[in-house]
Amino acid sequence: MALVDKHKVKRQRLDRICEGIRPQIMNGPLHPRPLVALLDGRDCTVEMPILKDLATVAFCDAQSTQEIHEKVLNEAVGAMMYHTITLTREDLEKFKALRVIVRIGSGYDNVDIKAAGELGIAVCNIPSAAVEETADSTICHILNLYRRNTWLYQALREGTRVQSVEQIREVASGAARIRGETLGLIGFGRTGQAVAVRAKAFGFSVLFYDPYLQDGTERSLGVQRVYTLQDLLYQSDCVSLHCNLNEHNHHLINDFTIKQMRQGAFLVNAARGGLVDEKALAQALKEGRIRGAALDVHESEPFSFAQGPLKDAPNLICTPHTAWYSEQASLEMREAAATEIRRAITGRIPESLRNCVNKEFFVTTAPWSVIDQQAIHPELNGATYRYPPGIVGVAPGGLPAAMEGIIPGGIPVTHNLPTVAHPSQAPSPNQPTKHGDNREHPNEQ
């Protein structure tokens, strides 16, 4: 009898010790599964396979924080976003647990990075995103301006008869030879350099202005560097913008700088809409000071010809912020963004992040291990959080089968994939994982 009592005492002590405590794993941090949200999209089929073993993934399909479900605002510790939603300080303050934001793309002007840093939120981007696509699209715009293919197509669609030499001269008026022309690039990062390589093949003389770039790059690419914006504008037959938008270069192209450009120069912008004062550009196009312009980005997006200062501007080509897009680029960007979120979860913020853009403003917050244990939602992977609750948005024709989840009072979204077994422990920063090993891209360096 005494022996039985002794065993009971031992079991009681063991139960008290283990109650509510996960067993320690020596090779990594101990923390619950965090909630990660894709803010302005509804397809997270690429992100889920990378994150599902250590995080709950939801998508919001929102265009503003007013459309984001309060569960995401209260519990999401990671967020991924495109360029179609803007996060100001006021918006960022609505997130109660947010630690990291990854912009799926290179630009981050739609996030107040200073406010984010002061709130302890790291902001990352994908600087290698869609470099080739953006460079190719830029060259297409430049060639279009010089060879006027868009206007020739429009003339034929409108029934213009083009048979005699005189008719050809009339309809193709303004077409120009490229060889020997000078292309000026404002900003000479990854995309600017890719444009320079392509432009040289067409016979352009290339020069650039970039006050942040170290000397020597121009020698390796066989281009010329100028050290003032005025010099670039004065010497260029075509000016193309390839810089980020910030408080220092808003409306970089304005009435004053346009007057410094060569008479009849071309302007191309596939960077950020806020770099160009569209009112000044429209006036310059009407007066002929600028011969033609091609814009992929605009001050107000989504862009419409029906409104705004450009609606009556001549010799203008506009595309809807699509210079970056290809299926391959989109896939690589999304994989890289999810991998950056994975680094944040398994490592330290901001030290473990590869592309943190607001370290100078960053304020350290509590470690991941103190996240509320109630914020564990393994059954909600791929759920839709959208205000008002209960509404699930599905694209026409449906999405690839990768969504599952429950919305309180709403419509369940399911798929026929096997249930994912979620491990209780995330790997340490130094422990290799199949996602970290297989999904790194050399061009992220």
From Swiss-Prot:
Residues 414-445 are annotated as: Disordered. Disulfide bonds: none annotated. Isoform 2 is specifically localized in synaptic ribbon (at protein level). It is found in: Nucleus; Synapse. NAD(+) binds at residues 106, 186-191, 210, 243-249, 270-272, 296, 321-324. Residues 434-445 have a biased composition (Basic and acidic residues). The modification Asymmetric dimethylarginine is found at residue 22. SUPFAM superfamilies: Formate/glycerate dehydrogenase catalytic domain-like, NAD(P)-binding Rossmann-fold domains. Corepressor targeting diverse transcription regulators. Functions in brown adipose tissue (BAT) differentiation. Isoform 2 probably acts as a scaffold for specialized synapses. The modification Phosphoserine is found at residue 428. This is C-terminal-binding protein 2. Keywords: Differentiation, Methylation, NAD, Nucleus, Oxidoreductase, Phosphoprotein, Repressor, Synapse, Transcription, Transcription regulation. It comes from Bos taurus. Gene3D superfamilies: NAD(P)-binding Rossmann-like Domain.
